[in-house]
């Protein structure tokens, strides 16, 4: 085998290494551009009308505690460690334990 054959055998693997690398690089750049274009088209645009969440706690003696008009229950707490409660008509917390000394309703509305 002559020197030109040896040189050819050395150059072929080197050319294969160079060519796929540049192809992969251009494929990566094309994919990056496509991903950026899609993300830019999905950009979040907030509504010009902004709302504020206002909340208050209403504590009552006994088992029920109701929110003021226009507010809705978002959570309840019951005295004597009672962890069993339900919301009635979206505006009233009702503790389900037989003995409860107080009930608190967390009431919120959007302004």
UniProtKB/Swiss-Prot annotation:
It holds the Pfam family Resistin. Keywords: Disulfide bond, Hormone, Secreted, Signal. GO terms for cellular component: extracellular space. Expressed only in the gastrointestinal tract, particularly the colon. It is found in: Secreted. One of its GO terms (biological process) is epithelial cell proliferation. The keyword Amino-acid biosynthesis does not apply. The keyword Secreted applies. Residues 1-23 form the signal peptide. Disulfide bonds join 55-108, 67-107, 76-93, 78-95, 82-97. InterPro entries: RELM, Resistin-like_sf. GO terms for molecular function: hormone activity. Probable hormone. Belongs to the resistin/FIZZ family. Homodimer; disulfide-linked. This is Resistin-like beta. It comes from Homo sapiens (Human).
């Amino acid at each position: 085998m002559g020197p030109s054959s040896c040189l050819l055998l050395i150059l072929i693997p080197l050319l294969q290494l160079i060519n796929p690398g540049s192809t992969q690089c251009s494929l990566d750049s094309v994919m990056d551009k496509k991903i950026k274009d899609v993300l830019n088209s999905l950009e979040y645009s907030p509504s010009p009308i902004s709302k504020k969440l206002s909340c208050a706690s209403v504590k009552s003696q006994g088992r029920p505690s109701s929110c003021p008009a226009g507010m809705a229950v978002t959570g309840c707490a019951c005295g004597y460690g009672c962890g069993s409660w339900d919301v009635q008509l979206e505006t009233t917390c009702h503790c389900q334990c037989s003995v409860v000394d107080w009930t608190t309703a967390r009431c919120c509305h959007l302004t």
